[in-house]
């Protein structure tokens, strides 16, 4: 997992509340358990004018010119600005996978659905909760200024606007540690590889009959 320390990126404003996981990545794309291949179908039913199918070449599909991520000014955005209850609906880890593969490093909103919020941290995507008034101010600035960028400083737990105004955000200390060091569940386990190896050796020595079939 790529470490997240500080990131400055173009902001895309998704001015919709209660965006659910089926809108983030529709159900027909959930057959794969790999973490890759979902970015092209992020917000598929909003980005395209037709119905997407797994394995289809998206380069030939008609784009929806009214969807924000298709606007030329937001191409290359890496910070998503959203409204309340982002990521609600069914539990699917594919949602943060799709956002991450598209290129988003952080999502800023007044609130998130709990399962999506937890899944995001496990996959290197930083969900940031700010006060609704602060999110409103960011929407206003983003819509008024083409090329609008924000700096997210995870170490300091701050979001900095181009005019220097900063907003602080809360994050669990353990989740912060994992993001700063690029540690997912597998990475955390591998940190204890030596201790796990010692336990296995001791376990085998104390209870060898359990391992007879493995000799």
UniProtKB/Swiss-Prot annotation:
The record's Gene Ontology cellular component field reads:
3-isopropylmalate dehydratase complex
What GO molecular functions are on record for this protein? Answer: 3-isopropylmalate dehydratase activity
Reactions catalysed:
(2R,3S)-3-isopropylmalate = (2S)-2-isopropylmalate
Which superkingdom heads the taxonomic lineage of this protein's source? Answer: Bacteria
SUPFAM superfamilies xrefs: LeuD/IlvD-like
Per its UniProt record, what Gene3D superfamilies does this chain match?
Aconitase, domain 4
Question: Main EC class of this protein?
Answer: lyase
Name the EC number(s): 4.2.1.33
Fetch the Pfam families from UniProt: Aconitase_C
Q: Please name the InterPro entries in this protein's record.
A: 3-IsopropMal_deHydase_ssu (IPR004431), Aconitase/3IPM_dehydase_swvl (IPR015928), AconitaseA/IPMdHydase_ssu_swvl (IPR000573), IPMI_Swivel (IPR033940), LeuD (IPR050075)
- Keyword Aminoacyl-tRNA synthetase among record annotations: no
Q: Which pathway does the record list?
A: Amino-acid biosynthesis; L-leucine biosynthesis; L-leucine from 3-methyl-2-oxobutanoate: step 2/4
- Which keywords has UniProt assigned to this entry? Amino-acid biosynthesis, Branched-chain amino acid biosynthesis, Leucine biosynthesis, Lyase
The UniProt family comment states: Belongs to the LeuD family. LeuD type 1 subfamily.
Question: Function, please?
Answer: Catalyzes the isomerization between 2-isopropylmalate and 3-isopropylmalate, via the formation of 2-isopropylmaleate.
Q: How does it assemble?
A: Heterodimer of LeuC and LeuD.
| This protein's name | 3-isopropylmalate dehydratase small subunit
Q: What is the lineage of its organism?
A: Bacteria, Pseudomonadati, Pseudomonadota, Gammaproteobacteria, Lysobacterales
């Amino acid at each position: 997992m790529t470490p997240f320390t500080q990131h400055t990126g173009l902001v895309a404003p998704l001015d919709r509340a209660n965006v659910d996981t089926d809108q983030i990545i529709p159900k027909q794309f959930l057959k794969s358990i790999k973490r890759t291949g979902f970015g092209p179908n992020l917000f598929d039913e909003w980005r395209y004018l037709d119905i997407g199918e797994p394995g289809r070449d998206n380069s030939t599909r008609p784009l929806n010119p009214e969807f924000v991520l298709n606007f030329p000014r937001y191409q290359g955005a890496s910070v998503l600005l959203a409204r309340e209850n982002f990521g609600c609906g069914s539990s699917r880890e594919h949602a943060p996978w799709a956002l991450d593969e598209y290129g988003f490093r952080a999502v800023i909103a007044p609130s998130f659905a709990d399962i999506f919020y937890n899944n995001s941290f496990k996959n290197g995507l930083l969900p940031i909760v700010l006060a609704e008034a602060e999110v409103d101010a960011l929407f206003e600035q983003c819509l008024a200024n083409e090329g609008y960028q924000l700096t997210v400083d995870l170490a300091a737990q701050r979001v900095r606007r181009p005019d220097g105004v900063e907003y602080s955000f809360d994050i669990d200390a353990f989740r912060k540690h994992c993001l700063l060091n690029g540690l997912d569940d597998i990475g955390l386990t591998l940190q204890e590889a030596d201790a796990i190896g010692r336990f296995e050796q001791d376990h085998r020595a104390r209870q060898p009959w359990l391992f007879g079939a493995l000799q």
